[in-house]
Amino acid sequence: EYLNKIESGKMKPSKELLEILHKELARFNPEAPLTMLFDYVKIRFPTLDIQHIIKDILKLNINYMLHEDYGHYSYTEHYSLGDIFIYTSADEEKGVLLELKGRGCRQFESYLLAQQRGWYDFLMDALVDGGVMKRIDLAINDHTGILDIPELAEKCRKREYIGKSRSYKFYQSGELIKHREDDREYMGRTLYLGSLKSDVYFCIYEKDYEQYVKLGTPLEEADIINRFEIRLRNERAYYAVRDLLTYYDAEQTAFSIINQYVRFVDEEPDKRKNDWKLNDRWAWFIGDNRQSLKLTTKPEPYTLDRTLRWVQRQVAPTLKMLKKIDKGNGTDYMETIEQ
């Protein structure tokens, strides 16, 4: 009778009921509630031939790249194209290091698309060339609010989770994690599962809040509500890539890692903890009654932002000086450059 009154418009459902209905309807959304992306890729190549890596592995043109006589991670120089970075030095043990952060991954996907290649093709080329996986991050985007980060944090506090590591950290504000994240001022409530010093840990945060702070996108209009990042280093990164290239099944690779390290349960006082029922929301997230998850791409074009910053920093001061010399001495250095 209560539902009939709501359906006929004689009664308005409560705010709490509307939230429940929206969440349940999201289960039947024809669009996949979850998508997955590469969000960080760092590979070291045991060679000093940076031109070979850029031309034959990345399949990019080194002539279009910016070159700088400094680097990070104790490398002495680097080449960049937008947010794609390749570091090198004279130290043979260091070799050549490729680093793609979030935007770098999106920009590189544009080049992969133009090359009629995909991530699997690139990773296979990298491994065949002796590439050493230093870090791989897989980001699972939650588009419908499957995950409830405060609820997961509370379950961690109450020890209602089973995993290899009991270590967790929950932050209400991104300001508290400024020494760990590049986008720390944008991240909303954030939960880390596992030791941050280990080769495997997870980071779950409110992506809709990040987009609100960064772009002003209203929370209710955000395409991605939460993001679950699987962060892998060294050997663990290698085994994940090997698994991807063996089975070509991103969902299997991602959730086999998650299930191996953590699962959230609901307390049942009369049972052993290992026999507690899997939490319904968590069960849905890891694959119970939802559409399958596939590796997706979200290519973004290269922008001139970084190039313009480089021109302002490296070139503009010299041009300004030449203009003054031309004006004072009657020379035509600027005209020669423009030709």
Residue ranges and their predicted role:
Residues 10, 21, 311-314:
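DNA major-groove recognition helices of helix-turn-helix
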Residues 14-29:
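DNA major-groove recognition helix of helix-turn-helix/homeodomain DNA-binding modules
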Residues 1, 19, 302:
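Residues within the helices of the helix-turn-helix
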Residues 27-302, 307-339:
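Structured, helix-rich domain cores that form ligand/interaction pockets
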Residues 12-15, 92-94:
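Generic alpha-helical scaffold signal
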Residues 1-13:
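Recognition helix of helix-turn-helix/homeodomain-like DNA-binding domains
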